[in-house]
C-alpha cells in the first residue's frame, strides 16, 4: 500500500513507550490508522486491484511511505472520502460506536455526558450520541474547545476547569451514560 495518510493515535504513543495492553515484537513501525492506494497485491488477492483507494483497520506500519497489510484488514474507500478522513475515521468512530451502541446501548432520551469531548474520540461520541437520540453534555477545557464541541452538536457545554462542574452537572438533571474519552479525575467525579 502506498500510504497517503496516517493518524497518530494515543495507542501509538503507548506502544512506543511499551505501556500498551499488547506489546508487539520488535522492531515494529507505528501507525495504526492508515489509508492509501494499493500499489501491489499478492497472488491470492481477488477483491482489490492496483490503484484502489483503501483504509486499513488495525495493526501497525502506517508511519512509512509503503506498507504491507493483510487483505482482511482493508476496505475500499467511498469516492467522496478523502485519505485524511479515512485514516482518522476508523479508531475514533469505532471506539465510540462500540462504547455507545453496544456497551451502553444508548437510546433516544438518554443523557450522555462526554468527558474530553473536544478530542477525536470525544467528538465522534457527540456525533453518534446525537444520532442515537441522546441529550449530550460535552465537557472540555477552555473556551476554544468548548466552541468546537458546541458546533459538533452538544446540547450543553461545560468547562472542565470550572470548580463548580459537579453542581452544574447536577443542575442539568440526571446522567444515564458517562463516556470518558481521556481518563483521569473527572471520571471519578462523574
Please name every model-derived segment.
Residues 4-5, 73-103:
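Extended, non-globular alpha-helical segments
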Residues 87, 93-163:
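Mid-domain Rossmann-like dinucleotide-binding core that forms the NAD(H)/NADP(H) cofactor-binding site
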Residues 1-7, 19-61:
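Glycine-rich beta-strand-centered segment in the early N-terminal region that forms part
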Residues 5, 52-53, 66, 111, ...:
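Residue-level marker of beta-strand positions
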Residues 58-71:
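A structural motif shared across PLP-dependent enzymes of the aminotransferase-like
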Residues 137, 152-190:
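Glycine-rich cofactor phosphate-binding loops and adjacent beta1-alpha1 units
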Residues 11-17:
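Cytochrome P450 core scaffold surrounding the K-helix E-X-X-R motif
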Residues 49, 79-84, 105-111, 173:
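Short helix-loop-beta connector
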